[in-house]
């Protein structure tokens, strides 16, 4: 299964073929499966709404392969007992482990909890079509186990993500004359605020909240005030 996932390109928002693979795999195992977009999920055979539910979740989308690859990223290669390929670690390996654990317990009648297995999409881009799009379909969840590469250590907390697209509005003018209002100069003050601001609250486990300015776009010509 992991080798198949590696060899099917599944960039974020383009995971339809790996979603097809996962859906077919569950169905072949006799598991009733649900799908919305490229999110695939299933419940244990003896699901009981009076019991607490444990969510098993990981994602099947990947980032683009970087230029440093020395092997074919879309070829599952085993060397020295290790499996190489794009998504083998993040997060195909954890995903397959969770799926196999789910199947191992799928038809048990004596479980004190329900199991909900969700293989989700668009994780790498925090996309609207990812896990957040199906939360209302999953029902109440007591606790979640998320498969991610954590060096085989249990991780009990994680920083969230908020992306801000900020705009500074200027007025165009010729760069050689004292005219226009430079949007870059306006933005510098705000960029410095992002760099120096300290939030009053800190996480006991993760420390202070960090804000970083990562992309700046401005101007169209060297001689025009943006």
Predicted features and spans:
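Acidic/histidine-rich catalytic neighborhood of metal-dependent amide-processing enzymes
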Residues: 91-163
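Acidic/His- and Gly-rich active-site-bordering loop/insert found
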Residues: 1-86, 108-111
């Amino acid at each position: 299964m992991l080798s198949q996932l590696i060899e099917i390109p599944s960039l974020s928002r383009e995971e339809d073929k790996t979603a097809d693979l996962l859906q077919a795999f569950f169905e072949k195992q006799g598991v009733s499966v649900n799908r919305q977009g490229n999110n695939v999920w299933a419940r244990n055979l003896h699901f009981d709404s009076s019991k607490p539910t444990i969510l098993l979740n990981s994602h099947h989308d990947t980032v683009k392969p970087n230029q440093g690859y020395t092997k074919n990223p879309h070829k599952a290669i085993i060397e020295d007992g290790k499996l190489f390929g794009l998504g083998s670690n993040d997060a195909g390996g954890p995903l397959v482990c969770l799926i196999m654990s789910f199947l191992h317990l799928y038809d048990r009648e004596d479980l004190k909890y329900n199991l909900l297995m969700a293989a989700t999409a668009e994780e790498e881009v925090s996309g609207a079509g990812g896990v957040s799009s199906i939360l209302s379909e999953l029902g109440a969840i007591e606790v979640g186990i998320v498969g991610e590469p954590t060096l085989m250590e249990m991780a009990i907390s994680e920083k969230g993500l908020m992306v801000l697209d900020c705009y500074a509005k200027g007025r165009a003018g010729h760069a050689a004359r004292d005219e226009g209002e430079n949007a870059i100069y306006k933005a510098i003050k705000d960029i410095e605020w992002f760099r120096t601001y300290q939030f009053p609250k800190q996480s006991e486990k993760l420390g202070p909240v960090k804000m970083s300015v990562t992309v700046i776009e401005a101007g169209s010509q060297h001689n025009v005030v943006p």
